[in-house]
Each structure stands twice: as structure tokens, then as C-alpha cells.
Amino acid sequence: ATMVQFDFSGKVEVLVQKNNGELRSAVVRPLSKGIQPEIDGNFLLFTLDKPQKLSVEFNGDRLNNLHVFANPIIENVPDKNDPNVMYFESGIHEPTDVAGKCFRIPSNTTVYLEGGAVLKGCLTCDSVENVKILGHGMLLEPQQGISVAYSKNVLIDGITVVNSRHYTVSGGQSQGITIKNLKSFSYQGWSDGLDFMSCSDVVIDDVFLRNSDDCIAIYTHRWNYYGDSRNIRVLNS
């Protein structure tokens, strides 16, 4: 499977070329969107007028498809010179924490991944509060994507996580986690999507998960996390 993403407003025409064989038929899912592509030779064309997450499938093949993530344009981009902002520009970034391969996030911090930013490491929120992780950048093959432990008020919005070896997002004994417009792919054993252990007040909204283990799993006590789980909602996903 392959993936493309872009930001837009208004209307956009999407032109797709199949470059590895004859294009006999194509479908754009979810079918509920009612998108009927025009086919011309090995090209297909369709129009979008709002942000969507789509699967373009060729010749009835659901596995070797093209994921199209049409994102809204981000408004109010954080100031990269703000001391409370961790700003990752387009390019490849590796953490200085070589042993854990993690970017550690303090309280009252906004993490912004610019489009084209690729982080080769995990993001860790441990015993913090009031954290935002935003942008249309990517985490690439981290040991774990985003870890939220013993924390409060964490927002994750817009990023893509590709081939995390374990959880894309894990929450442990935390409160007030919101996840929006997240895209996640994984292929290994134990590579869950979103797992929550003893968490409360969690909102999962408008996410796309193609994971090789559980897409979403909810636990009470597990490992060093204690307490019940409550008020966890999954919307538009």
C-alpha cells in the first residue's frame, strides 16, 4: 500500500496514475462518500471539496491501495521562537536521547511537526499537563509512537505515525486525552493503534488506523497503571 497527503481549502482535483499494470476498474472508499472517479486509460480523476481520508483501490485489490489524506490547512501555526514550542521543520529529526530514542515533552508545551517533518523517535509525555502535539508531519518507525503516562490535558492533532513497533498512542493512568485527525500504519506483532490503561475523559475523533494488532484497546489496571477507565469516546473514525 502507498500513501499521499496534502493540505487544501476550497476544491481540489486529484489525478492518480496506476503505474504498475493495466487499470481496469477503481473504487474510492468509503463508499458512503459517494465519490465516483473518472477513468481514462491508467489515470483516474476525482474532486474533493472538504478534508477526507480515502482509500483508492485498483482492480478490486484492497491490500495494495493508495491512501489519500486530504487535510485542512492549519491555521494559527505556533511561533517557532516561542520558548514553550518545540518546532520541527521539514526534514529528518532524531532525538538526542539516543538510548531511549525519545523526544521528552515538558508541561505547558506545544510540539509542532511541520509538513514534511519526519521524527525518527517517540514522543513522551510523562507526569506532565497541558501538552499539544500538532501538525502534518510524521513519526517514522519509532519503538513506540506517543506515550502519555500519569498526565493531564494532552491534545494530539493531525500527525501520521508509520510502522511504530509498539503502540501508536498509549495512555496510562491519564486524564483528558484528545486525539484528532491522526493517521496510523503498522505491520508488526504487538503494533497496536491506540491503547488506554486506567484512563478517563478520552476523545478519539476523525482518525484512520490500519494496524496489524488491535486498532483500539481499552484496559483498566495493567503494568504500573491503576484505576478504572471511563468516558472514552470514539467518533467519526
Language model region names:
Residues 1-80:
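Beta-strand-enriched, solvent-exposed domains that form extended recognition/catalytic surfaces
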Residues 108-110, 115, 129-139, 152-163, ...:
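Right-handed parallel beta-helix
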